[in-house]
């Protein structure tokens, strides 16, 4: 019997959990400072929350359908995927509990001792009981569940205390006490040279029985509910007489009440209570987990933050590393007219970009500023710069994606403020999320329109620009500006951009271009010429791209992939992906930039983009990228890739079985931390040229053609009347988000 060829595909959900495993591994990595290890444990917990809310929630929805479709990569049904991820989640949670105990022990050696409420001495017992009675008890809202009192609604990600009660008159009932999210999650008390810390839910659980003094508490525990957060916009909601913000607001209300998909319990949770909650919330046994680590990992961020704030513990955290500021007198708005500019976050500050927006908003030659907005800071200076421009009389067009998951409300709020300032706000496509990072500043000089275009890999968010690695390419090349203008015009008219020369625009001109680039490398390899592909992004599961990568490998093309998260292609499979080398970088900063490089030397073609290689990016989103033709910047981008391929600190390399092994330095060689090395790499990144001649004018390209998206009506677009101008400072600092 002929042996079945080994699959090159990995299930998306299992690959997501593999990424979470790599994050969790840093919680035990001894080369990582203790305070940072606590944060990685917290990040792991936050990632698991999202995994259940989004992925398990979606799979749960699919199991309810009669036509149970399969995963397009591994062809597993939703039920099969849930069955596969269940033991993996349990394994990871057990590791997290083990690492948490190690962290607690290590903290004790540093003078931070966790309170064990089962072993309190009398003075401590008196202190904590008094604190509970004075500070917490008046704010608690206990609820009884019996024949006369229905089971209450339990909020997503909130912690609850539950007790099984018995009284002579009423028999068995249950008492539930919400642990208010308004409470300080971690409490700190000095005890001599030691700082004691306690999780507030454990304190409440220790004394909560006193609330139900009329009954006998037979059993008790803490638990936490995770609910499905996978909301979709139905066709019936696309009534264009209704403001789309109202639709999203209603969906957000519905999301709060979606089905429970996970229950977390204290260790040794009584089975009677577990069964009671399972029955009430309709959660199967395989999605109920007990854990010794905090039920809400967010409290670990609070713990690390307090230790950092105490001072004197610098060795417990990464050395300070702030984004490099531009030199005095550096003016990006002027500089980009002399040469293309690349900014790399978090190594360089985002401030020059913000100042560029402010300069444009005050420039009398500027006619309009257009920008796509996906995830914004809650107190966004970037959005305030747009508001200031509108109040200065500029036409400001903001494409706000209201469906950015978990940022919907923030985006709704900002869209209202933009509209109030006189900006034109529209919400993109019915069927495609707009995930692009695109800014276009249009000026009219001597009767001609001139463009300044910015294309990025990351959000317009000052906060995350210090945490995520991203790239921002800024140019005044006329041909790129014309293509960007066509993209904005097409989006406003609900049309998809299908033609461009330098830009990539998903879903019609993103995957096709990159597949053509791979085909060129395959053709070179078939001719015996040097050929190479380097792909850096966050995730990949597009089967068409995976098949092309396999084809390239079989043709002899070396394919290097730097994929931080989900990776559904298996490296090193004989006869399929032997020439594919995959690594994941997980470290101090979240790797977020996307760089696609084909060939080397003078023949090299290199792109940056907002989109990954997930099918949702290549086929169901409007993504934007650009081929970088500036030789100096192209070389800089290639240098980033080469440096990351040499990393021996943050890198883990995929093995042929799909597992990852930590990359270690060769014997006698120093470790290479590509993230920290970037600070040196971009040390002179703010290039100033005072005497460089202007670039020769490129021939004007025909405007990008567009194909109409299937059955697209007039866009949801509103433009409020322009209010009176309020002045720059007031508009920047007087409009804090409510």
Residue ranges of predicted features:
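N-terminal localization/anchoring segments of enzymes in phospholipid and broader phosphate metabolism
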Residues: 1-533, 551, 555, 567-738
């Amino acid at each position: 019997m002929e042996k079945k060829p080994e699959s090159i595909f990995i299930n998306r959900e299992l690959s997501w959990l593999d990424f979470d495993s790599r994050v969790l591994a840093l919680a035990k990595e001894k080369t990582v400072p203790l305070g940072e290890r606590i944060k990685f444990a917290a990040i792991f917990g936050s990632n698991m929350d999202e995994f259940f809310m989004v992925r398990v929630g979606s799979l749960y929805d699919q199991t309810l359908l009669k036509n149970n479709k399969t995963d397009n990569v591994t062809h597993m049904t939703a039920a099969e995927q849930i069955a596969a991820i269940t033991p993996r989640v349990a394994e990871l949670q057990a590791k997290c509990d083990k690492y948490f105990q190690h962290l607690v022990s290590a903290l004790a050696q540093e003078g931070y001792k966790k309170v064990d409420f089962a072993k309190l001495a009398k003075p401590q017992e008196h202190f904590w009981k008094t604190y509970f009675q004075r500070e917490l008890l008046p704010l608690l809202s206990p609820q009884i569940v019996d024949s006369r009192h229905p089971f209450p609604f339990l909020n997503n990600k909130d912690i609850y205390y539950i007790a099984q009660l018995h009284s002579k008159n009423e028999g068995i009932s249950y008492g539930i006490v919400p642990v208010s999210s308004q409470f300080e999650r971690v409490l700190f008390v000095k005890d001599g040279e030691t700082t004691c810390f306690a999780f507030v839910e454990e304190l409440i659980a220790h004394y909560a029985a006193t609330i139900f003094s009329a009954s006998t508490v037979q059993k008790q525990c803490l638990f936490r509910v995770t609910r499905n957060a996978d909301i979709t916009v139905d066709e019936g909601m696309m009534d264009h007489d209704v403001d789309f913000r109202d639709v999203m607001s209603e969906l957000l209300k519905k999301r709060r009440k979606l089905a429970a998909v996970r229950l977390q319990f204290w260790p040794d949770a009584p089975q009677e209570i577990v069964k009671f909650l399972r029955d009430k919330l309709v959660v199967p046994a395989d999605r109920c987990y007990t854990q010794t680590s905090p039920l809400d990992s967010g409290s670990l961020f609070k713990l690390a933050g307090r230790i950092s704030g105490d001072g004197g513990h610098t060795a417990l955290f990464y050395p300070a590393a702030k984004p490099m500021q531009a030199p005095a007198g550096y003016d990006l708005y002027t500089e980009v007219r002399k040469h293309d500019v690349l900014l790399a976050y978090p190594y360089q500050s985002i401030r020059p970009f913000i100042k560029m927006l402010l300069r444009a908003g005050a420039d009398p030659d500027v006619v309009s500023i257009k920008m796509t907005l996906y995830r914004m800071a809650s107190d966004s200076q970037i959005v305030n710069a747009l508001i200031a421009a509108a109040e200065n009389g500029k036409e400001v067009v903001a494409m706000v994606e209201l469906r950015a998951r978990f940022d919907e409300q923030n985006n709704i709020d900002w869209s209202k403020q933009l509209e109030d300032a006189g900006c034109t706000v529209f919400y993109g496509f019915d069927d495609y999320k707009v995930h692009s990072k695109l800014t276009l500043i249009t000026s009219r000089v001597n009767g001609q329109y001139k463009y300044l275009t910015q294309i990025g890999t990351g959000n317009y968010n000052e906060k995350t620009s210090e945490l995520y690695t991203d790239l921002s390419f800024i140019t005044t090349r006329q041909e790129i500006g014309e293509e960007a203008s066509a993209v904005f015009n097409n989006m406003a008219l609900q049309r998809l951009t299908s033609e461009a020369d330098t830009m990539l625009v998903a879903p019609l001109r993103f995957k096709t271009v990159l597949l053509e680039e791979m085909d060129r490398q395959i053709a070179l390899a078939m001719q015996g010429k040097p050929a190479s592909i380097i792909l850096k992004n966050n995730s990949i599961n597009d089967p068409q791209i995976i098949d092309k990568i396999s084809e390239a490998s079989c043709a002899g093309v070396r394919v290097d992939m730097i994929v931080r998260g989900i990776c559904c292609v298996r490296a090193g499979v004989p006869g399929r992906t032997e020439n594919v080398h995959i690594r994941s970088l997980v470290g101090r900063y979240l790797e977020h930039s996307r760089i696609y490089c084909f060939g080397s030397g003078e023949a090299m073609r290199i792109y940056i983009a907002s989109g990954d290689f997930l099918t949702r990016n290549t086929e169901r989103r409007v993504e934007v990228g650009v081929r970088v033709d500036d030789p100096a910047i192209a070389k800089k981008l290639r240098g980033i890739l080469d440096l990351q391929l040499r990393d021996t600190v943050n890198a883990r390399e995929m093995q042929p079985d799909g597992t990852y092994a930590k990359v270690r330095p060769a014997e006698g060689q120093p470790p290479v931390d590509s993230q920290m090395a970037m600070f040196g790499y971009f040390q002179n990144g703010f290039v100033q040229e005072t005497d460089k001649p202007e670039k020769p004018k490129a021939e004007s390209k025909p405007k990008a053609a567009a194909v109409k998206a299937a059955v697209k009506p007039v866009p949801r677009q509103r433009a409020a009347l322009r209010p009176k101008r309020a002045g720059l400072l007031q508009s920047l600092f007087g409009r804090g988000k409510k």
